[in-house]
Amino acid sequence: MESGSEEPDEQLLLLSEPALHAGPPAGRAAPGGAVRLRGEPGLEEEEEGEEDSGPEGDGEEEPLLRASGRGRRAGAARDKEPRVGAGHTGHAIDMNTFLDDPEFAEIITRAEQVIECGVLPERISQGSSGSYFVKDCKGKTIGVFKPKSEEPYGHLNPKWTKYFHKICCPCCFGRGCLVPNQGYLSEAGAYLVDDKLGLGVVPKTKVVWLVSETFNYSAIDRAKSRGKKYALEKVPKVAKKFNRIGLPPKVGSFQLFVEGYKEADYWLRKFETDPLPENTRKEFQSQFERLVILDYVIRNTDRGNDNWLVRYEKQDDGLNLSDKDIQWTVTEESTIKIAAIDNGLAFPFKHPDEWRAYPFHWAWLSQAQVPFSQETRDLVLPRISDMNFVQDLCEDLHELFKTDKGFDKATFENQMSVMRGQILNLTQALKDGKSPIQLVQMPRVIVERSSTGSQGRIVHLSNAFTQTFHSRKPFFSSW
């Protein structure tokens, strides 16, 4: 195992004062989550306490590149954890209000209504955590809900895989670079980053509260629910004093379901025997580059070729489509689209430097050897080369992550230091015309904000950032 032990030669660079501008419209919801409406005091969902860990890093330090003078919007609506009003039957309608996205709000409202009508979410058999297909009144899947308490290391995870992992192999339990039990925020944060960068590869994902009999609750919660419902029937006057009737709502990520997609592994094998037309190949390469940028910026530690999806609508060229194994859609013009799902193991507070490197599995594909296209560079480079844009992105993530009751500001700053370092590397790679494989081989960097720097969306004169090369490598490293 390699370890950097040199004392860093640190230099700070004061960034120029950018121009101010007007703030956002009033009533803007916190990005990636619902506006929390406070009701009568009541019971909240019981969650397992989370451990906060500090960062590790060593190596040489250099001053960060200069910032541009453009400013971004300031401020966002602050939200609080919800409480269920007295006499509440257990549904979460009052908790899910999305002022900036009425279309998504309507989808969640319909989901809550059909659950109350008896169309319950269905647990997904795959995976190592409790996740659920949420359906509409016709039984059609409209979204995937992943409760915080049922994440791989959550105390109510209904699957035993991680429990045996913890008991039989505690030394390798969990990922030492990630904040435990924060996957639902990582899912919503990945969509936030995707939306800010204009990538369009992550299905819309936000934090919501839902309640259903099919979710995994403790025996105590279920017993309380039965007792309160019985009291409501027998002694209504007493039951009216209860803070909540029914099971407690669960907080988690809700991702809109995408139709017509299959695992990337399936299509990659198909493309080996049936190559794509040139125009479609270029479109696929462009989509692939957007996936690369997303994963690299959020430092996804769990990206295999089985958890990103491809939808291929093949042009009608007169072929015999009787082969049931070829499940593509026939259109007048071929189109291809990538969907990046399963983003719950991202936003580490340090670069992986213990046992495993958690590589990006797309790095071994032939598409990763092609330099980033001019289209991708024109889309992303103007945004990430502006430090005010990067700071605004960090503030949006802060608004999202702080809604978790286990939020720790110091740990969050470490997460942002890693992300800023990834963005710095990406900026240089796009300027130099590098390929995705060359990008992941660049030295790992963290960019820390000085303790005297002010919090806010605009980089002020008082802000100073330090660039540090992280030289310590994992025991099992791919590059």
UniProtKB/Swiss-Prot annotation:
Signal peptide: none
Region annotation (Catalytic loop) ranges: 299-307
Location of region: Important for substrate binding: 151-153
Keywords, alphabetical: ATP-binding, Cell membrane, Cytoplasm, Endoplasmic reticulum, Endosome, Golgi apparatus, Kinase, Lipid metabolism, Membrane, Nucleotide-binding, Transferase
Catalytic reactions on record: a 1,2-diacyl-sn-glycero-3-phospho-(1D-myo-inositol) + ATP = a 1,2-diacyl-sn-glycero-3-phospho-(1D-myo-inositol 4-phosphate) + ADP + H(+)
Domain of life: Eukaryota
Listed GO biological process terms: endosome organization; Golgi organization; phosphatidylinositol phosphate biosynthetic process
Entries under InterPro entries matching the protein: Lsb6/PI4K2, PI3/4_kinase_cat_dom
Subcellular location: Cytoplasm, Cytosol; Golgi apparatus membrane; Endoplasmic reticulum membrane; Cell membrane
Record's bilayer topology term: Peripheral membrane protein
E.C. number: 2.7.1.67
Segments of this protein annotated with the region Activation loop: 340-360
Region of interest: Important for interaction with membranes: 159-172, 262-270, 355-364
Biased composition (Low complexity): 18-34
Uppermost EC category: transferase
Start-end of Acidic residues biased regions: 1-10, 42-62
Record region (G-loop): 124-130
Chain ranges of the PI3K/PI4K catalytic domain: 118-449
Annotated region described as Disordered, given as residue ranges: 1-91
Annotated function: Contributes to the overall PI4-kinase activity of the cell. This contribution may be especially significant in plasma membrane, endosomal and Golgi compartments. The phosphorylation of phosphatidylinositol (PI) to PI4P is the first committed step in the generation of phosphatidylinositol 4,5-bisphosphate (PIP2), a precursor of the second messenger inositol 1,4,5-trisphosphate (InsP3).
Family statement: Belongs to the PI3/PI4-kinase family. Type II PI4K subfamily.
Entry protein name: Phosphatidylinositol 4-kinase type 2-beta
